[in-house]
Amino acid sequence: TLASAIASAR
């Protein structure tokens, strides 16, 4: 999901 991608980037 988008949230997962954002969390991975952080």
UniProtKB/Swiss-Prot annotation:
* Tissue and organ expression note: Nacreous layer of shell.
Query: What domain of life does the native source organism fall in?
Result: Eukaryota
Name of the protein in its database record: Uncharacterized protein IMPP4
Species assigned in the record: Nautilus macromphalus (Bellybutton nautilus)
Taxon lineage: Eukaryota, Metazoa, Spiralia, Lophotrochozoa, Mollusca
